[in-house]
Amino acid sequence: MSKVYDWFEERLEIQAIADDITSKYVPPHVNIFYCLGGITLTCFLVQVATGFAMTFYYRPTVTEAFASVQYIMTEANFGWLIRSVHRWSASMMVLMMILHVFRVYLTGGFKKPRELTWVTGVVLAVLTASFGVTGYSLPWDQIGYWAVKIVTGVPDAIPVIGSSLVELLRGSSSVGQSTLTRFYSLHTFVLPLLTAVFMLMHFSMIRKQGISGPL
């Protein structure tokens, strides 16, 4: 094993990278409340893993979506556990994100020179809320259907472009298959990709600038 490690070390300087990751200074004022962002990240990773597992059984059609969710809950091996963890972790992610935002605001972590870190965090908060809206509709039950109808109907109040935005969100003039397809694509591909990109930016800036000092 040492020869294999030495081969990679010679080319990639693994030890230097590991030292840089593990040797960052942690200010003495840091407490458990500074872990809220990391807990949010952990919840996101759980969401990715459990969500990926459910894509093997979920069918994003208005005629089969609800039945496929029932199959996951009643027949698929450990399907009930995977979906339950997905739901619990989703709620935990939203809660931890809200608490993290409050912690950063109350401790002044948004001030110079960390304005861009705050901006990426706000974007991540919006993406997290979007996960909730799109995921809520996927079982395509009565609650999901009417939630989608209400949410996608909100932009209709915007002058001039309102009706166009509604049709863009729904895929047609009414809620149906096109709407479910759009929400499924957003929930399983677009939002996770954007979240991963902004999380990378967010953590890179934290690594560069360090943790903000006490008030």
Swiss-Prot record:
The chain crosses the membrane at residues 32-52, 90-110, 116-136, 186-206. One of its GO terms (molecular function) is oxidoreductase activity. InterPro entries: Cyt_b/b6_N, Cyt_B6_PetB, Cytb/b6-like_sf, Cytochrome_b_N_euk/bac, Di-haem_cyt_TM. Heme b 2 binds at residues 86, 187. Component of the cytochrome b6-f complex, which mediates electron transfer between photosystem II (PSII) and photosystem I (PSI), cyclic electron flow around PSI, and state transitions. GO terms for biological process: photosynthesis; respiratory electron transport chain. Gene3D superfamilies: Cytochrome Bc1 Complex, Chain C. PROSITE patterns: CYTB_NTER. Binds 2 heme b groups non-covalently with two histidine residues as axial ligands. Binds one heme group covalently by a single cysteine link with no axial amino acid ligand. This heme was named heme ci. Heme 1 (or BH or b566) is high-potential and absorbs at about 566 nm, and heme 2 (or BL or b562) is low-potential and absorbs at about 562 nm. Heme b 1 binds at residues 100, 202. This is Cytochrome b6. It comes from Glycine max. The lineage of its organism: Eukaryota, Viridiplantae, Streptophyta, Embryophyta, Tracheophyta. NCBIfam families: PRK03735.1. Keywords: Chloroplast, Electron transport, Heme, Iron, Membrane, Metal-binding, Photosynthesis, Plastid, Thylakoid, Transmembrane, Transmembrane helix, Transport. Its cofactor is heme b; heme c. GO terms for cellular component: chloroplast thylakoid membrane; membrane. It is found in: Plastid, Chloroplast thylakoid membrane. Belongs to the cytochrome b family. PetB subfamily. It is a multi-pass membrane protein. Heme c binds at residue 35. It comes from the Eukaryota. The gene is petB. The 4 large subunits of the cytochrome b6-f complex are cytochrome b6, subunit IV (17 kDa polypeptide, PetD), cytochrome f and the Rieske protein, while the 4 small subunits are PetG, PetL, PetM and PetN. The complex functions as a dimer. The keyword Plastid applies. CDD domains: Cytochrome_b_N.
